[in-house]
Amino acid sequence: MFSKSLILRNYFSLLDSKLLDLWGSALKQIARGWGMLLLSMCLAGSVMAAEPAKSTTAAAAKKPVAQAQRNKAKAKTKTKAPVKARVDTRPSFGKVAGLHDVSDELSLKSSVALVVDQETQEVLLSKNDSAVLPIASITKLMTALLINDAQLPMDEMITITQDDVDTEKGSRSRLQVGASLARGELLHLALMASENRAAHALGRTYPGGLQVFVGLMNLKAKDIGMTDTRFVEPTGLSSKNQSSAKDLVTLVQTAYREPLLRDLSTSDSHVVDVGRHSLIYKTTNRLINNPSWDIGLQKTGYISEAGQCLVMQTKIAGRKLIMVFLDSAGKFSRIADAERVRRWVEAKHRAVIPQT
């Protein structure tokens, strides 16, 4: 038989073993629980850490796209700056030469002026009349004179080409390359509206070409007694087209003898059909529509080197006069100078009517 003490010792050993097993199992469960908890915390931390990174990455990706969209919208709404015509701010040859410092009794704004009685050749007013200066579009009077002299068919169609586009001054024109007009229409626009492409096309299509035409311009000037004059092209855009007031009186007298030139230069407006649309041109001389003036022939001109220019045949106080104004200082001063001369002639130089 087992002793009581042995049984008790075995019982407690077994109990200790069971307790150890239970304790170990409990520890394992606790460890497993803590492990899961730690793992969950780690995973949660990773997710939390990843979310800002993901948001930052997405924001970073969206930022250039949003900026591009804003730039695109801005580009759409941005007003395009208007294209400006070339502005030439060079002083006139007359100003450089000091011609504006010369005074006259009428305080004219033109540095050169000459008023001559067409019938008697009496000089009523003279200011720097021998100075040789650029004459701008006054040139077109000589261009018109040659076209008229040549007796070319006025109904012949002429097409504007790239050669007629102004590359010297960058001046604008409503006559587009490819437009076709009759020679007579081009002559009308050149004289009345000072259309540069029209004048150039007239010279370019002259028999023999532009070079021959310019040579004939200079020959014609010499033939009619213009000794201070030189032409290099038919529009007046070049400052190398030069003359004096004395010579321009001669040119006006010669051109005035041609009825067609008188009629076209004093027209106040003209409509031309170009393709499927019409263009309305108006005179460059506002005195044409002034009832106080009786103008038989006229031409205006302007480039910066020449200043504002004006030549006219007109009748004032019973006298037929030729007026020349070159290198006028302002946009309207050539007209104001003409008005001063008209009032002066009416007051002091009226025609003397013979007693019968």
Each predicted region: which residue ranges?
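Residues in and immediately flanking transmembrane alpha helices
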Residues: C42-G45, S130, P153, R276
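N-terminal secretory targeting signals
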Residues: F2-V112, A347-T356
